[in-house]
Amino acid sequence: MGAPLSTTRRGMGQNLSVPNPLGFFPEHQLDPLFRANSSSPDWDFNKNKDTWPMANKVGVGGYGPGFTPPHGGLLGWSPQAQGVLTTLPADPPPASTNRRSGRKPTPVSPPLRDTHPQAMQWNSTQFHQALLDPRVRALYFPAGGSSSETQNPAPTIASLTSSIFSKTGGPAMNMDSITSGLLGPLLVLQAVCFLLTKILTIPQSLDSWWTSLNFLGGLPGCPGQNSQSPTSNHLPTSCPPTCPGYRWMCLRRFIIFLFILLLCLIFLLVLLDYQGMLPVCPLIPGSTTTSTGPCKTCTTLAQGTSMFPSCCCSKPSDGNCTCIPIPSSWALGKYLWEWASARFSWLSLLVQFVQWCVGLSPTVWLLVIWMIWYWGPNLCSILSPFIPLLPIFCYLWVSI
């Protein structure tokens, strides 16, 4: 036939280095077929050939889910080719561009609590004192360590939030005060909405109650019908404009609205008196007259630059002044109580009962009002036999 191959073998392309993209021919097990390991070792010793680095790394599951067939001599003698399921470590990711260009990686900064423990104190004063340190200030203002430089770091969300809701170094907001401050307006808004929805039904209900006082057997038909303006049968509380009883219904509802406005005015006076907005001089003991004006013996004048006078003065004929300070709260209520007690001595017996009522919480008062609103008429009919016992109970209450 001929002599063995003495020249460089060419096959699988002009290049002697045959790539191995599919991972076949690991460890050159098929080289003896081409006599590459015997008489023509040029295949293994070709410096330009691919060394096939991935040939020996047959991934687990490359020939099926979780299985590598033990093909032995065909695929090589690696543990993967022998059917041993071993996981080879993955190659590290390639280096980034900036590291190839010579830039060194940024070292990990130590924790702030280790380098500057004084900056970790939850105290605004100590925190601002720590900012005086240039090293600590450089952490927050990298551009020169000053907030007045042209190059400032981008503000964070936390800094924006703190700058909106509070000043730098200011005290933390008290959530209890915020909640209590919002609860009052919400309750008032709820009451206003309730009154707006009931603005027509409340006068009508009161009108029905007022009219029912004249008709114990129930509300009859409206007696205001005549032949000139015939109307259908209706109640006296819902007269149409063509009915002669319409003007009386309007008069009753107008009086009801006046009483509602009077109740609102009383509620406003009570609120202002509780907040100390009504500086009423109390009655001076032993005198029935009070007056406000400059006092010779008072440290603070009754008529001064302040919004409200701080003391009340009684001016007898001799010119001497008796000064009594105005209460900071319930000034009008105390004045009315002293005025009524001076004229009706039996009211002094109710002092303990009034003090007990004042000591009740608003929740108890709201519960009592709600019970009277719904169960009041029924309770009146049930408790009517016991009404004569009420004075005896009050006397025993005061005496004990």
Swiss-Prot record:
BP GO terms, sorted: caveolin-mediated endocytosis of virus by host cell; fusion of virus membrane with host endosome membrane; virion attachment to host cell
Entry's localization field: Virion membrane
Lipid linkage positions (N-myristoyl glycine): G2
The record's account of how the chain is modified after translation: Isoform M is N-terminally acetylated by host at a ratio of 90%, and N-glycosylated by host at the pre-S2 region. Myristoylated.
Chain segments annotated as transmembrane: 182-202, 254-274, 349-369, 376-398
Chain segments carrying region Pre-S2: 120-174
Stretches the record annotates as Pre-S: 2-174
Region called Pre-S1, residue ranges: 2-119
Topological region Intravirion: 2-253, 203-253, 370-375
Cellular component GO terms, alphabetical: membrane; viral envelope; virion membrane
Region (Disordered): 84-114
Record keywords: Acetylation, Caveolin-mediated endocytosis of virus by host, Fusion of virus membrane with host endosomal membrane, Fusion of virus membrane with host membrane, Glycoprotein, Host-virus interaction, Lipoprotein, Membrane, Myristate, Transmembrane, Transmembrane helix, Viral attachment to host cell, Viral envelope protein, Viral penetration into host cytoplasm, Virion, Virus endocytosis by host, Virus entry into host cell
Signal peptide: none
Biotech use, per record: Systematic vaccination of individuals at risk of exposure to the virus has been the main method of controlling the morbidity and mortality associated with hepatitis B. The first hepatitis B vaccine was manufactured by the purification and inactivation of HBsAg obtained from the plasma of chronic hepatitis B virus carriers. The vaccine is now produced by recombinant DNA techniques and expression of the S isoform in yeast cells. The pre-S region do not seem to induce strong enough antigenic response.
Similarity field: Belongs to the orthohepadnavirus major surface antigen family.
Protein name: Large envelope protein
Organism, scientific name: Hepatitis B virus genotype F2 (isolate Argentina/sa16/2000)
Lineage: Viruses, Riboviria, Pararnavirae, Artverviricota, Revtraviricetes
Gene: S
